Amino acid sequence: MSIPATSTLIRTSSLELRSIRFEEVAAILDLIRRAIERGCSQHYDPGQRNAVFLTYARGLFAEAVGPFEGIVAVREDALVGFAQFDPITGRLRAVFVDGDAQQSGVGSRLLAEIERRLRLRGGKRLYGAMSLNAVQFYARAGFRSLSGPECLASAGVSVPVVRMEKLLRS
């Protein structure tokens, strides 16, 4: 997996943001599973949560050959967040924060880093299909809804999402 030129290490307080390393894939998958189980249980049934996990797991491995770029958030040597996006189109694929680190600014910092990287490349917008449990988080970060809840197929299971976007300022 190549590390892009924009993989500058960002470290403030005790949080470090950087591009993912291949040896972290198992830890990232574990973080994604925990975040889905904790954060999505009010909006999605177990089958839907498993389908979402499988979709993100496949996407993480596809990053090695596909267009997506991944960022991890590390605090005190522990992986506490993960984000994945397409640096060409601005499609946001994922932002996951470990349960104990939720509500501590990790997700906001990951989004800010994605926006920084997109702006460096001339990106004008960040968009994606957001899970129902995360709509308020994205709205607070300046995203607007493009649709009401709609269902997407995720690993063969129908999962409701809301399409959202944020226009980036230069």
Task: Give the label of every model feature segment.
Residues 2-10, 156-170:
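Terminal substrate-recognition subdomain of acyl/acetyltransferases
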Residues 3, 10, 19-23, 30-100, ...:
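Acetyl-CoA-dependent GNAT
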Residues 15-16:
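Extreme N-terminal starter segment of soluble prokaryotic enzymes
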Residues 105:
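Glycine-rich phosphate-binding loop
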Residues 110, 134-137:
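Conserved short alpha-helix immediately C-terminal to the canonical SAM/SAH-binding motif I
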Residues 118-131:
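Conserved GNAT acetyl-CoA-binding A-motif
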Residues 127-129, 144-163:
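Conserved catalytic-core motifs of GNAT/GCN5-like acyltransferases
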Residues 138, 143:
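Conserved active-site tyrosine of GNAT-family acetyltransferases
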